[in-house]
Amino acid sequence: MKSCALLLGVCVLLAGGCHQHPLTDYRPLDQAGMWSSGLEQLKKLDTSDSEVAQLVKAKQARLSDDTCVALVAAAHERKHPFVSGDATANLAGAGYSEAEILEIGRADQLDSISGDAVTLRLIGLSDNFVQIVLRRHLQGLRTLSSPEIARLKNTGLTEKQILERINSGMTDAQADHEIAVREATRNNSGTGFSRVRGRKPR
């Protein structure tokens, strides 16, 4: 009985020490251009097949092996698999650096803020403005959504004026109200009727 119990204990320890995904197929990443050193690091992180599929998207967006490995490690530190291949690729396509993408990943906000972050780039705002807004997102501070920022910009507000509103804690609802007022004022300006004076008939 003691020998059976000991054998059972050893089996449990071995099972606990084994990777949960020993049969993961890393060939898609190899084909996507990842070096063997990167693949070995992913094996140590017990990367799953689904994570490999997500990382292929990141590699296709030309992210380095080190960043890919770091993103998986960051996700595992948060106790979940890496599932943000699309968000990562979109951020890279919008011009965000690998350091910025990794910072967002370590904050566990790739999926939650990638849409807004990409839109900020598409609006045509300065790098400084984008960095300030992104920093507020990462710090959990109230920040206007990208669509509202774009609409405020279209009403003629400067980046400085928009930042003043963001720093004051303006909500999307408040921004929507100001946009409506500014658009109404703009549309009504110059629409008054003026009397046309013509030459009197002889």
Regions found by a protein language model. Give the residues of each.
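General marker for long, soluble alpha-helical cores
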Residues: C18-R202
